[in-house]
Amino acid sequence: MTGFLRVFLVLSATLSGSWVTLTATAGLSSVAEHEDALLRHLFQGYQKWVRPVLNSSDIIKVYFGLKISQLVDVDEKNQLMTTNVWLKQEWTDQKLRWNPEEYGGINSIKVPSESLWLPDIVLFENADGRFEGSLMTKAIVKSSGTVSWTPPASYKSSCTMDVTFFPFDRQNCSMKFGSWTYDGTMVDLILINENVDRKDFFDNGEWEILNAKGMKGNRREGFYSYPFVTYSFVLRRLPLFYTLFLIIPCLGLSFLTVLVFYLPSDEGEKLSLSTSVLVSLTVFLLVIEEIIPSSSKVIPLIGEYLLFIMIFVTLSIIVTVFVINVHHRSSSTYHPMAPWVKRLFLQRLPRWLCMKDPMDRFSFPDGKESDTAVRGKVSGKRKQTPASDGERVLVAFLEKASESIRYISRHVKKEHFISQVVQDWKFVAQVLDRIFLWLFLIASVLGSILIFIPALKMWIHRFH
């Protein structure tokens, strides 16, 4: 009896499971059949090329919104902005209505967008020729006739770049959407939300979106008005990369130019250093030329700074050549030192610049008076007493010795004079180096401040 009961329970459970499975399968089959019947009913005689309205005077209201997922690139050279977006579009199709009770309670269906009438909304500022730019995904059709279609799209839109304050610049790029063929009497655009949806936005490493808003407008052509929606993206560049690898090296090069005047003029590296700095600046200019657009309307901030430094370095080379020329002057090169140069560069300016003349200046006695006196005494003695032959020989020897001493004295004085002139010109060159060191240092600091401070103030102000 117990065994029979067990067999009965097992058979009952098996039959119950089979009944549930058959019921579920029948339910699914019923839903599929209802959906198939609904699609045949909706698209029987449906013409996607005709506006789905009851009356020809009716206007289809398209609710339009934009969701940005990624700011792919901002190309200043070609003045392009590349974005990945979702286009939110919703309208009512009067030909796609049904009673859910007649089709198993189906309230919505997914339909390929190629089979539906579409408002042919395109991006007007397209730069790559793909005006539609979107993927033909499926649309959701509700029983009330409401069609919701949110295709993803990748756009390259034209954007006029203002690189005046590069790399502390801010750009305002816009995306203008509208129907390509329908005017305002057929299709009207209505903004879902004036703000661009950025919930799923993937941050860009170079640019930051400060603001992104949409605004509706109308473009008139004769008697017709064409509605459109313009989304404005306010972008701010993150300047850390360019500050570290462009601006700071340029600042370093400008201060290297100042250090040229700290090198001794005896060294031959003064001109080599200046020339190397000039070549480095030329390389930086080539790098910037590859980044910014080729425009004659504005000069970018970093371009102004590099131009300033190049003029700065060129002047330093000219001044260095002049200082080296002064350093190697002497009386033998027919450059005697004028009295005013001695007073200014050997007496006054060294005191003001806290410089000390390393030369120990001393003067030799003239010796002309002593020579005349000696000659007079010798002649007097010869007149007073008649000299013997031995005395005459001794006097002649002494006169020759005196002449030799005078020659040596004149030679020593001449060498001392030449050495003193050479050292004086070298000291004048040192004074000039010190003067130009301070002048170029002040000019470098003030020039950097005057060029960059306004841009930094603007960038910080916009940040706050």
From Swiss-Prot:
Extracellular side: 31-238
Key words of the record: Cell membrane, Disulfide bond, Glycoprotein, Ion channel, Ion transport, Ligand-gated ion channel, Membrane, Receptor, Signal, Synapse, Transmembrane, Transmembrane helix, Transport
Glycosylation sites noted in the Swiss-Prot or TrEMBL record: N55, N172
Membrane topology: Multi-pass membrane protein
Pfam families per UniProt: Neur_chan_LBD, Neur_chan_memb
Reactions this protein catalyses: Ca(2+)(in) = Ca(2+)(out); K(+)(in) = K(+)(out); Na(+)(in) = Na(+)(out)
Regulation of this protein's activity per its record: Activated by a myriad of ligands such as acetylcholine, cytisine, nicotine, choline and epibatidine.
Cross-referenced PROSITE patterns: NEUROTR_ION_CHANNEL
GO molecular function, one term: transmembrane signaling receptor activity
Gene Ontology CC terms: acetylcholine-gated channel complex; cation channel complex; dopaminergic synapse; neuron projection; neurotransmitter receptor complex; plasma membrane; postsynaptic membrane; presynapse
S-S bonds: C159-C173
InterPro entries membership: Neur_chan_lig-bd (IPR006202), Neur_chan_lig-bd_sf (IPR036734), Neur_channel (IPR006201), Neuro-gated_channel_TM_sf (IPR036719), Neuro_actylchol_rec (IPR038050), Neurotrans-gated_channel_TM (IPR006029), Neurotransmitter_ion_chnl_CS (IPR018000), Nicotinic_acetylcholine_rcpt (IPR002394)
Role summary: Component of neuronal acetylcholine receptors (nAChRs) that function as pentameric, ligand-gated cation channels with high calcium permeability among other activities. nAChRs are excitatory neurotrasnmitter receptors formed by a collection of nAChR subunits known to mediate synaptic transmission in the nervous system and the neuromuscular junction. Each nAchR subunit confers differential attributes to channel properties, including activation, deactivation and desensitization kinetics, pH sensitivity, cation permeability, and binding to allosteric modulators.
Name this protein carries in UniProt: Neuronal acetylcholine receptor subunit beta-3
